From Swiss-Prot:
Signal peptide: none annotated. It holds the Pfam family BolA. It is found in: Mitochondrion matrix. The gene is BOL1. Present with 238 molecules/cell in log phase SD medium. Disruption phenotype: No visible phenotype. Cells lacking BOL1 and BOL3 display defects in a subset of mitochondrial [4Fe-4S] enzymes. This is BolA-like protein 1. InterPro entries: BolA, BolA-like_sf. Acts as a mitochondrial iron-sulfur (Fe-S) cluster assembly factor that facilitates [4Fe-4S] cluster insertion into a subset of mitochondrial proteins such as lipoyl synthase (LS) and succinate dehydrogenase (SDH). Required during the last step of iron-sulfur protein assembly when the iron-sulfur cluster is inserted into the target protein. Probably acts together with the monothiol glutaredoxin GRX5, earlier than BOL3 and NFU1 in the [4Fe-4S] cluster insertion process. Not required for [2Fe-2S] cluster insertion into mitochondrial proteins. Gene3D superfamilies: BolA-like. The lineage of its organism: Eukaryota, Fungi, Dikarya, Ascomycota, Saccharomycotina. Interacts with GRX5. Keywords: Mitochondrion. Belongs to the BolA/IbaG family.
Amino acid sequence: MFKRAMSTDGPVARTILKRLECGFPDYKNFAFGLYNDSHKHKGHAGVQGNVSAETHFRIEMVSKKFEGLKLPQRHRMVYSLLQDEMAQANGIHALQLSLKTPQEYESKAK
């Protein structure tokens, strides 16, 4: 159940990680992945002129804080933590989220 993955170490990724650590302190107890998928979107119309190499991220996270919440509510929790980075001109352009409870993660792993 303890899986950790990070495919980036840039300033935006470090900020994302810091904010998630504050908002979801239990994430370290479960599966977590932060991936910079920006390289897959070079030349994409939405990021033309953006000088940042960190625009598209994928977050896979398991937390007890998601228990009893529907998917949109879980997404809103993460969006609220990252709203400043998403509002910046050279900030996060796209965010793909996979947010599960420990029980959901365990049942999927079987």
